[in-house]
């Protein structure tokens, strides 16, 4: 039986691969931050309407990713649910399934620039206006 030393370890990436991933992820986060940090963002980009006016919060296909030096972590990928006005909602799930990142996305407390809510909508009803938190400056 011959032993093959040249077999790659599937859990290892080279320094060159890591640098390429980091470079690409920096480009992505810089583009998102550039859009987010614009001055005089028109209200049309973040003022919206609730799908159901009886809700105070609506998560619709929310995607929050972390762009690291070794790849992209899709912490929240396609989460959708509603929170009706006057109701208490609990989020239950296994360790590491994205419960905290989902709530941090609503509060705009995801650690930037590596963490970004890149897709979907989080509609928040203040009573006077409805904001899409994902696009709100």
Predicted regions and their residues:
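ABC transporter nucleotide-binding domains
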Residues: 1-137
């Amino acid at each position: 039986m011959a032993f093959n030393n040249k077999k790659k370890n599937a859990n290892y990436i080279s320094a060159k691969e890591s640098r390429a991933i980091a470079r690409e992820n920096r480009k992505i986060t810089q583009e998102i931050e550039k859009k987010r940090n614009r001055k005089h963002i028109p209200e049309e980009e973040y003022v919206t309407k609730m799908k159901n006016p009886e809700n105070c919060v609506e998560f619709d296909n929310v995607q929050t990713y972390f762009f690291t030096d070794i790849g992209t972590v899709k912490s929240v990928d396609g989460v959708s649910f509603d929170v009706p006005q006057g109701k208490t909602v609990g989020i239950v799930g296994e360790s590491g399934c994205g419960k905290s990142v989902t709530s941090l996305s609503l509060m705009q407390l995801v650690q930037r620039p590596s963490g970004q809510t890149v897709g979907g909508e989080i509609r928040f009803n203040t009573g006077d206006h409805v904001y899409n938190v994902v696009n709100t400056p």
